[in-house]
Every structure is written in C-alpha cells, then in structure tokens.
Amino acid sequence: MNQEIMNLFNPTTPAQVFDQIRISIASPEKILSWSYGEIKKPETINYRTFKPERDGLFCARIFGPIKDYECLCGKYKRMKYKGIICEKCSVEVTLSRVRRERMGHIELAAPVAHIWFLKSLPSRIGLLLDMTLKDLERILYFEYYVVLEPGLTALKDRQLLSEDEYLKAQDEYGQDSFTAMIGAEAIRELLRGLELEKLEQTLRAEMQETDSDIKHKKLAKRLKIVEAFRHSGNKPEWMIMTVVPVIPPDLRPLVPLDGGRFATSDLNDLYRRVINRNNRLKRLMELRAPDIIIRNEKRMLQEAVDALFDNGRRGRVITGANKRPLKSLADMLKGKQGRFRQNLLGKRVDYSGRSVIVVGPELRLHQCGLPKKMALELFKPFIYSRLDAKGLSTTVKQAKKLVEKERPEVWDILDEVIREHPVLLNRAPTLHRLGIQAFEPVLIEGKAIQLHPLVCSAFNADFDGDQMAVHVPLSLEAQLEARVLMMSTNNILHPANGQPIIVPSQDIVLGLYYLSIMREGMNGQGMTFGNMAELEHALHAKAIHLHSKIKYRWEGMDETGKISKRWIETTAGRVMLGNVLPRHPRISYEIINKLMTKREISGVIDQVYRHCGQKETVIFCDRIMALGFYNAFKAGISFGKDDMVVPAGKWKIVDTTRTLAKDFEQQYNDGLITHGEKYNKVVDAWSKASEEIAKEMMKEISVTKKTATGADADINSIYMMSHSGARGSPAQMRQLAGMRGLMAKPSGEIIETPIISNFKEGLSVLEYFNSTHGARKGLADTALKTANSGYLTRRLVDVAQDCIITQDDCGTHLGIKMRAIVDAGTVVASLGSRILGRVPCDDVRDPATNAVLVKAGTLMEESHIDAIQQAGVQEVKIRSALTCELVNGICKMCYGRDLARGTPVNHGEAVGVIAAQSIGEPGTQLTMRTFHIGGAAQLNEQSFVESNFEGRVVIKNKAIARNSEGHLIAMVRNMVVTIVDPDGSERATHRIQYGARMHVDDGDMIKRGQRIAEWDPYTRPILTEAEGTIGFEDLTEGLSISETLDESTGIAKRVVIDWRGTRGGADLRPAIVIKGKDGKVLKLARGGDARYMLSVDAILSVDVGTTVKPGDILARISTESAKTRDITGGLPRVAELFEARKPKDAAIIAEIAGTIRFGRDYKNKRRISIEPVDKTEEPREYLIPKGKHIHLQDGDIVEKGDFIVEGNPAPHDILAIKGIEELAAYLVNEIQEVYRLQGVLINDKHIEVIVRQMLQKIEVTDQGDTDMIAGEQVDKIEFDALNAKAVEEGKKPATGNPVLLGITKASLQTRSFFSAASFQETTRVLTEAAVNGKIDPLEGLKENVIVGRLIPAGTGASMARIREVALKRDKLILDEREKQAAIVPSQPEPQPLALPPAE
C-alpha cells in the first residue's frame, strides 16, 4: 500500500534522459499523435460557472482536469479514482498538471502553407519548386491558378493563369483536358509530385554544365535544400499543413481579474480566429457556396494561420482590442523577452537578498559582513531544520513563530547555521567571472552589507551607494564549489592577464607610499637598530622619524632556507613593511626597500603569490591593507589650493607658441601651406606647449625642498597622491595647475584655440564655453559606450561558449611564431611577456651556444623566460589555440597556463567564456570615438625615428639618393634599418618612410638616442629617380590642373584637379616626366620611363624646365588631402576587427610577388597588373579608381602581401594571401593596440581563442567525389569527416580554403541550433535547422543550460567524462554478448561477463 501511495507522487510522465535533440518538420500524422482530441469550438470558458466549455480551447475532456484528481462535474473526487474517465463529463481523473503537457489539434478544412517555410528567406518552398516568392504568394492567396498537368494542350507545366485566362483555356481546350489548381492545395500537389532523387541528379548535371557564376550559385542553393530533404527524412509536402497543433492550455492561460474581466494570452485570440474561420469554411463547403466565397474564406484561413505562427511576417499586423500587435508563437521565442533569453538562459533564483554595501576594513579577505536581519531570512530553512533537530519546535509552524519573535535561541542557531556556510556576493553588471565571489558571512548589526576593500577592484565597486546581491548556495555540492572555486581568496589573479587583482588602491596605497618615503637630514639619521622592539621604542620617543635613513639588522632567508642576518640601509617605515613580508629564499628585502607606488605593490604581491603560494599571499594582503589604512590616517595628507603649483615658465611657453601660431597663419596667408596643413601645425604646436607646461609643473611640484635645518621638507600632497597611484593622474594635475589644453568639438575634431588657463587661475567665459563642448560629448559617449560594450561581450560569449579544455595534448606540431612587438623603436610588449605560460613547439635554443634553454612541450615559467631573455632569443614558436587540432574544444598544451591560477589549465575549464569576458569587460573603458585626422593631438604624428640601442646600422632593400640640397633621401618603400649589437643579434628594426631624410648610412655605428631618419608627417612626396629637366604631360590648365587662389590669402598654387568629369578629359593621364639633354623622356634603371603619374589633389613643387636630381620632390600630396582614412579607434575598431568587416578604403594587397606594370585604363579606373616572378603563376590584375594615389611606379618590384594602395587591409585578404598565422598576428596586434592605448592588459591567448572560433568554416573549392558542393561553406569537423569517409572508400577527397567569419555570423552558424537560435534571428535559424533535420549534440554550455542539464565545463565536465567511460564499457559488453551469441547459437542464456576495469 505504502508503495502505491508513494507512486502517486511520481511524475505522470517519466523524466527523459537524452544526449541529443533533433528538430524536424512535423508531419500531419505526428501532430495527430501528439493530440488528445480535436478542438471544434472557439469558446474558452463559461462566463457563469468559469468551467471550460466542451470541445473548446480549454476543454477538460481533451486537456485534463482543472483540479487535482477531480473530474469536471465533481462525480469522482480524490486519489482513489486515479485514471478513471468520468462517464458523465468524459474527464480523466488525474493531476491538473497534465494541462501543461497535453496538446490538441484543429483539423483544417483546407490546407495552408506554413509561413516560416514560405516567407523566411530564402523561401524553402520557392527553392524546391524553383518558383519566385511573388508567384507562390499569387497562388497561395488565390490570385492565380497554376497548371499541374498540361495534358495535350499548349499550356506549359507550372504556368500561372489568371481567373480569365483559366476560364478561356477551359473553353478552348475543354474542361478535363488539363489540370490547374489554386491555393495551398496546388502547392501541396506540386511538392508531393517532386522526385527528390531524380531532381538531385539533374541539378548536379546542370551544375557541371553551366559556366555562369550566378546560375551555379542558384543551382547550389537548390541542390543543398534538395539534399537536406533527402537526408533528413522530411517530406516536402509537410511544409503545407492540414492539421494545426494547439499548445496546452496552461501555457496560454486565461486568468479572471477582479471586476469580472479576464486577462488572456494573445495566443487564445489567434487560435479563436483560426477556429472561427475554419468552422465557417466547413459550413460554406457543406452548403456548396459559390467558388468565390469559399476561396475568400480559404484565403482568410491562410492569413489566420499565418498570424498564429508569425504575426506581421506577411500582410498587416493583427492587433488586439488595444491596438497592440498580438504576440504570435514566433514572438514567444524571439528577442530579449522571448522564451530563450528570458526564461531559459535568464532564470531567476529563489534564495537571494540585496542591500547597500559599506566598507569593512576589519574583515579578513574571505569574509563579508551580513546584516543579521538578512541572514535570518536567507537561512530560514536551515534554521527551521535545526530548531526541529534540537527539539525546540515540533512543527514548521511553531518554528516559524519562534523565528518571527526573534527569540534568543534563534540567534544562537543562526550562528551555528552560518558557520562555514559561504554565501555568494554579486554586483551588477557582472562583466567577468570576478563579479560573483564567495565569502564567509560574519553577522553584523545594521542593514548594510560590509565588503572587504581589496575585492572592490574585482567587483568594480565603490561605496557611493552601490548595491550588491547575496545568494545562498543550498546543496552541499554548491557549497563545496563556492568554497573551492569561488572563494575570494582563490581569485587573487586576474583571468585576463594573470596580474594580481587583489591590489590595494587609493588610501591604502597612499599610506604605504607615505610609509616608504626616505628623506635626507631627518632627526635620528644614521642610527642603528637590532630589532623591531628598539625601533618602535625610538619611534614613540620621537628619537627618529618614520622617514629617517637608518641601519637595521634584517633577518631573512638564504638560498638553503636557513635564517640569515645582514645589515641594510632603510627607514623605519620600510622595516614595518618588511615585517609583514613572508620569509622565503626567493623574496629579498630589496623588493620593498624602495618607494612603494601602486605598481610596485602589485609587483610585490605577484612575487609573494608566485613563491609563497596562496595562503601566505592572502595573509600578506590583509596585513598590508591594515598597515596602509593606519598610516594614511597617521600621515594626515590633505589637499589644499596652494599644493597646486603653477609653473613659473608657463607664460613664456604660451607666448612662444602664440608667436608660432601667428607664423603658421602668416605662412598660410602667403600660400606656402594649405588650410589643412595650417590647422595640423597649429594644433600640434599647442599640444606640444601643453605637454611642456605639464612637464615644467611636474618638475616644480616633484622637487624636494629643504627646510631651514637642511632636512628634506614634506613632499607635496597632490604629487604624493598622483605619484603613488592612489588618485589623480598627471593629465588631471595639468588641468589643475598647468593649462587646460585643447578641447574637442562634439564631432571629434579639435578646436584650434586652446584653453590657456587652468582651474586654479579660473577659466574665462569663452574658455568655459569651449570646454563645455567636450564635456557634454563625454557624457553622451559614456551612455552609448555601455550598451555597445555589452553587446560586444554578448557576441563574443556566444561565439566562444563551446570552447572548453577537453584533452591533455592534441599532439600537433603546428604553432605560431612570437616575437617582441616594437612600435616606432620602443618595445611595447616584450617577447617574455608574450610567451610566459605557453608551451613551445620546438626546443628553444641559445642563439650563441645552441644549448637547449627550454625543451619542446614544457610549460614556460618565469625562470625559463628570464633565461630566454638573457640569451637574447628573438623568436619562439609556441603552441596556440589557433593551431590546436582537437575536434571539439582545445587541449591543455595548446592553451598553456590558466592565468587566474598560475598553474597549467585544468580539464573542463571554459576558456571560451573566459576569453570573451576578458575582452568584453574592459570594453567600457575604451573610447567610442572615430578619430578624424587633423587632430594631431590624438595622433602624435611620427616625424622621425631614433635608435634606442647602440650598435651598427644594417640597411635592407637599400636605395638612397643624394638630392640637390645634398641630403640622403630614402627612395623605396620597403627599406628597413636594423640596429645590430656587437654579437650580431638584431636589437631593433625600423621601417623607413618613402622620401625620408636619412641621417645614417649602411655600416655606420650609432649611439643611443641618435636620429636615424626624419620626414614631414603631413605630406607624402613624389620623388624623381633620374637627373634631368622637367616636362609636363596632359597637365592642361583648366582640364587637369588649376591655379587655385586661396580665398583668404590670394596666393596661387598649382593643384591637379579631377580630370575625369571634364569634357574630353576622360583619356588624360596627367604626369610629370624627366627629360634628358636630347629632350627625350629618360629611361629608368629598372625599366620603364621616368614618368610619374599624378593623382587628384597633388600640389606641384616644380615647373617645366626645372633641373632636378634624384631624390628631389616633384609634387606633394598633403596627407590631409590624401584623406588618410578616418582612424576608427576604441570600441568600434575592436568590433570591426571581430566582425571581420571590410574597412572603408581597404588596402589593395599584392597576391603574388612580381613586377608592377601599368595597363590600359578602364573607364575611370587605373589598371595595374603584376607579372609574377614565378612563371608558373598567372599574372594578377587590379583596377584602382583614378583619384587614389598609387605610390608604385611601372617596373617596381613587390613582394607577396605588399600594399599596392595604402589603407587598412581587409582581414579576408590577409587570410587568403598570407595564411592563418599572419591573419592571427594581424588581428591580435590590431586589437591589442586599441587596448594598449587605454593601458588595459589582455593576454594574447584570449584573442586567439576567439579567432579560432572565427575560423571554423571551410569553403569547398573542389568537391572531389564527396557530397559537398563547390562554393558552399562547411564546418571544419564535417569537412574532415566527409573527406575521411571518401578516402576510406577510395574516392577523391574535396579541397577547400579556410574562411574567416565575423563573430555574429560565426555564432549563427555554430553546430548547435539551440545556441544559434537563442542568439539572434531565431526564426531563420529554426527554419533552417528543421528543414535539415539537424541534431544538436548538446556539447556547448548554452544548449545545456537551455535544456536544464549540468554544463559540460568545470564540475560538469568530469560528469561528462565519467558518462563517456560508462558508455564505452556498455558498448564493449554489448559487442561481447553479440559475439558470444554468434558463436553459440544453441545456448539459451549468455554467461555474465567479467567487466573490464573502469578507466
């Protein structure tokens, strides 16, 4: 009996265990098999009794009872009648929960087309039938007939006939001589008549024959969909529906409101319309109504069903009573409020609370202060169970009363319950995983949560009113995970870059900085102390000052780990700091025996973590926090107006710059420079002045002054705050005490007149007005930035969510080469910082001795990096996520170190999500601006390069000429200057601009800081390579050249104008030629004439008949008029790169190495071809718009990958021309550059993981003997699998090239349709998936969250691995049984097997 009662509580339907989910088109039989009955009436519930009407939309007979175990009429009540069907009201006695599961159906009187397959582009029905959407709609909505069987008439198959034509044809050929139909029936017949196998063969044959690219594409599309239907087992006619399923009533509820009205789901209205029209159609058909009426009714039925499935997809949107569009089934899934994102991926939790946060400086790092009131509420169930266990209450009700009265014993129990039970704290927005961390609660009075100051930077929290949420992990497993993985003490390093994130900030930093100052001449200087007690005594007695220079006997550890003592020169403050430092052989006193700025402290924490481990680090952090707070309070550092020092030389600098600006104005008036150049120069001059004033100010403020006694005076407070890294930056100090500087207009341009005053002196009205411009734009930007940054993160997470560490080693030998990143001669990212925590592919050897420094396959630690840098290794080839050969996921070796732990990465780590968060989280710190060139203030134009090393100069691709002024001029674009040190290893390489003046020559010795070359950053020259006299070609006044008078100055200059639009100007090719003594055009050494083509806006620098020498300037293009592209910076640039968009004015890249040849012009484009060096290759041709400046001449030699036209290269071109490694290097460097500008550190591997996900597809170039279609994009995994199958069968495999997809596209094309559908374009993804009968293997994180299983990462990964092993064993056993059965057919029962041992 007991067993039976227990069974009653079991779910009515058994829970399904599944590994994959398949989606396909439902056949009418399938829909009927789901249904529990047909819905015949549009009624919902009776208005008097509130009981559902029979056969209506809420019918209890079909969908089940309203109350648990009670039929509708009330004849059978209670459990004992379970499963009986009442003979009076025909309702089954069961749980009312079945009303959430049971479906119904509507039998349609006429078939209708499913709108998704009709209207979702490309139209699937249209593709299959090879008809246009317009024609299909004409048939479906009863405008035209379609001929199905022309018979012996002159009509064609599938010809459309209007009403009149149809009647005429019937008269002409007789009624039964041909068949033509109209409406969905016609389409259904057409679809039913398709013979897919035959169709596939015809299409393949047609594809072989056709030459037209467009036709080939169209056929490929059709072939793909025909294959999809063949392989998936879907039948084409199922896209036309004869039965409509009705979803369970509890999923479209009707709720009575007070006042006798009802709130209902929109679906009920939509279903009602379908039923009404369907019933009306049935009646009309029974009555044999005229054709036209029936047809109209059928059309209305089609529209009603369309609206039910996807309202507004076709025709006008159907609105409810309040003019609001009704929410159809498709809308239920779509968008942020849809089922996927709202309910499946955005579930809410039950046990949580939220409150304002306040600072808790006396907490330990792993603690948080939880208000008692809050804890009592959150831990209620635990308290009830403890009260019960202790016998203080017998029922829940009693326990509830005790808790409500807040009896003393309740508080004691709360203390017990809370002990060692971590809670999760979360601050929105949770931009990365450190936004949720676990703490042990400490009960406090009051109503605010106390937060430890050191975790603020991880949460990005401050105490100006921020709120935080508290969540309680309930199950034991959850508590365990919270403690082991999420405890704040486990999150010391930042997952994005491996630097400590538990770093003191603000007042702690200030206190530690003050503590570590050393000042000359303070009292007690030179005293000696043996231990801490003596030192403290002297301090309290004021015999010495905290900052006095003293000698101290320090007890450290030597290499062997023994205590060793030595004398050190230090200050009392630094000894106090040294006292909290853990003792370890690798940690010397020297790391804190200096002025402690924020960066230094971060370094110390890093060292302590690396050498002493986590526990010591946590204790150390808590101690320095206490020390910092205490000393900040003792120091009494304040902020006063007189601490801001306006530099004495300010006005002198301002006056000089004003004169300069006047000069530029004058030069412009004299016509020597253009308006744009003047603007550039003025802005440049002012930004330099502003920097100089800032330098002067910093110099004055940072100088230590002496007091009367000769001791060092106190350091300036504001300088201390800024220098320590506690608050404020030199830029802010410049505005306070230097000069406010240049301001930007809302458009992003820079206003020429700077703000000369600073805030201390006060701004004039005009200056104030100018500065409001920029300030307002800043605020508007911030609002936009947050939304954009969040969207970028969402796209990144979506593309990378299924990237998980699944195996130890994929065994690949591939990798990418890493070298230091050098920008304009300075090392921006050293080789060491880039390869730390990665695995080398090959042994790393010392270039001098060839000894192995690091063996291949070793994870490189800090010690290895030191050795590599000492040896001067320039390049290391490392394993990378990009080259990992695992099918799903990445292997440990290719990923390397887990940055947040400093150890090799673990199995099941969700590296994709970590990468996405690391890139997305700093997004809000990036700027939103697109820089317009002109503001040199943002774009410190480089006008020279100087050497950062001593050594010898080596010039590659050397071509230097001495011009008529005697300067050495660089004559080629690919000239590279390398500085080589005495051992012969390269120190630095610099690319030299075309037309630059060289200060050194090949083989010269160079000193540090010496200039190598300089050039004018604002113009691009066109230089001559020959000596001779100038001649003009096609430079006709008024046609291709004009003397423009500058309006404001009245000075003439000669500029090439756009000659293509003028009459008779289309064939002109304006050029400057160099003639010899005989008056003929000179020939150049490299072949070709000395003829220099001019592009629009070139300003001539020479006249006919002038004599020139090699290296002289013939014309110049002002970069402002060469319209150097807008520089997209910040967030938009990162998004552009990840979306792999083609940039505006993209560069044109040479696909092969060879010689440039100018061909005949084509309309208004220049034709350039490359004659390949390798004669087996075809020459390549490029058409370039005439106005674009091509800086190559006829006969120039280009390498593969060189730019023919300058600009940003399109990433697809880089991939096609130079391959994956170059593309990865380009994307990583470009993205890093944006983040570096903002001072954000992100490890390269995160970007590599995302780029790996962008390269998952392959475009088939030749299909071989496989089923793939040339030109289609296939998943890498699928491609390899199909090829392997082909090779196995002895067929020819397909070939293909990798394709780069932007992150949005890549997310929509993942193998999991669940993941794609919940991202964007839900309808399209689901339609596509259903047609293909796709199977979702549920491998990623997102799909598993949607179906409500453990995600296959972290703890879920180990579960998945255990299941894998179990499945393998099951298979072995079954195989073994089959074998035994085959051997001994007579044996009745197979013997039990000895199981193979578990792995």
UniProtKB/Swiss-Prot annotation:
- Top-level enzyme category: transferase
| Segments of skewed composition (Pro residues) | 1387-1399
User: Which cofactor names does the annotation list?
Assistant: Mg(2+); Zn(2+)
Name one matching Pfam family.
RNA_pol_Rpb1_4
Q: Which GO terms describe its molecular function?
A: DNA binding; DNA-directed RNA polymerase activity; magnesium ion binding; zinc ion binding
Residue ranges of region Disordered? 1379-1399
Q: Does the keyword Metal-binding apply?
A: yes
Sorted alphabetically, which CDD domains does this protein's record hold? RNAP_beta'_C, RNAP_beta'_N
SMART domains attached to this UniProt entry: RPOLA_N
**GO CC field:** DNA-directed RNA polymerase complex
Subunit (UniProt): The RNAP catalytic core consists of 2 alpha, 1 beta, 1 beta' and 1 omega subunit. When a sigma factor is associated with the core the holoenzyme is formed, which can initiate transcription.
What is known about what this protein does? Answer: DNA-dependent RNA polymerase catalyzes the transcription of DNA into RNA using the four ribonucleoside triphosphates as substrates.
The record's similarity note reads: Belongs to the RNA polymerase beta' chain family.
Its name, as the record gives it, is: DNA-directed RNA polymerase subunit beta'
Organism (species): Bradyrhizobium sp. (strain BTAi1 / ATCC BAA-1182)
Its gene is: rpoC
